[in-house]
Amino acid sequence: MRLLVSVRGSVEARAAVAGGADVIDAKDPARGALGAVRRDRLAAIRRAVGAARPVSAALGDAGDAAMVAAAAAAARGVAFVKLGFGGVTSDAPARSLARAARRGAASATALVLVAYADWRRAPSLAPDRLVAVAVDAGAAGLLLDTARKDAPLFAIEPPDAVATWVAAVHAAGLFAALAGSLSGRDFATARAVGAELVGVRGAACVGGRAGRVSQARVAALQRLVRAARPSTLPLGVLP
């Protein structure tokens, strides 16, 4: 299992790298669960990280197909982009938007679709239905997150339900990632249900998700991740 830390700027990116994060994720927490950073800030994050770690970028929740394709194109040079489906509750538009993201992204950039455990409240497409959408779009993986940050993932979906979802993702040939107000205490459960990647922000910050990423906190989280089995993420997504 590997550790993704979401950062909102270059200073936080350097702290996450120094703390040992495996993936540096560009995201603006003030703009929601998948808030996209400005292009200049993404460029600054990429410069700060260099070749030290893969960088991912949140595209936000899907708008129209043209906007999604443009956002994916603007994130060229990252290892993967993450697309959410807040406000999208049926399969056909989800497929169209996911395909647009895949078309817009560079060929070397993987696509990760984001399902929300609290999909009824988001509202969004149910996580199990998003698996087929991901396969259709040529995505590399799926991330199960929470749209509203008022409860952690495993309080919304019990571990056995998450394990069933992860198994379906793996059966489709995709990797499974978990996020959603996770803490280090949740990592053992994430490993047990089969996730290849865990994503955090609040747990890595001093002052919660609106605070700043701490090198020491990232290092402490990485120590918990290192006990996990080796990742099976595709080599094209992470080195």
Regions found by a protein language model. Give the residues of each.
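C-terminal helical cap(s) of enzyme catalytic domains, especially alpha/beta-barrels
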Residues: 39-48, 90-103, 200-239
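N-terminal basic/disordered segments at the start of proteins
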Residues: 2-22
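Conserved anion-binding
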Residues: 50-156, 164, 168-175, 185, ...
